[in-house]
Amino acid sequence: MSNASGGGPRPRRRDGVDPALRSRARRRALQAVYAWQISGGVAKQVIAHFAHEQAYEVADLAYFEDLVEGVLTHCAELDEKLTPYLDRTIEEVDAIERAVLRLGAYELLYRQDVPYRVVINEAIMTAKRFGSKYGHTYVNGVLDRAALALRKVEVLG
């Protein structure tokens, strides 16, 4: 597969993961989690809708499905892990930032294969793209403190 500039294959990590495709999967997962939060839909229906409607855009479909199913399945636990680092209740956090935080918390807890810095950076970039003007700074602060608690050895190592 060639990159957008036509200059050869897209860069991949040693494990074969294409970071650009993962980023796209995260953006689509954000949209799915946001839709779920707003509609209260069933997890399988939300995933099926986004996987079907945007199949050509969800480049890493397996990762997209893992993120969405993971957040929807573990939502109460993720909220509990985030709560000590919030300055308000999780329900009072803007819906986009709430979805970004839940996705970030899921990756920090359950996707140890993804470095914490990547999780935080991707969350910041997603919040900048979809969130409020300063939402990305809030996301950064919350996830930075959560990472210290959830991945202390990695963060301090």
Swiss-Prot record:
InterPro entries linked: NusB-like_sf, NusB_fam, NusB_RsmB_TIM44
TM stretches of this protein: none
GO biological process: DNA-templated transcription termination; transcription antitermination
GO MF annotation: an example: RNA binding
Key word Flavoprotein present: no
GO cellular component: cytosol
SUPFAM superfamilies xref list: NusB-like
Stored PANTHER family: ANTITERMINATION NUSB DOMAIN-CONTAINING PROTEIN (PTHR11078:SF3), N UTILIZATION SUBSTANCE PROTEIN B-RELATED (PTHR11078)
Role according to the record: Involved in transcription antitermination. Required for transcription of ribosomal RNA (rRNA) genes. Binds specifically to the boxA antiterminator sequence of the ribosomal RNA (rrn) operons.
NCBIfam families: nusB
Protein name as it appears in the record: Transcription antitermination protein NusB
Gene: nusB
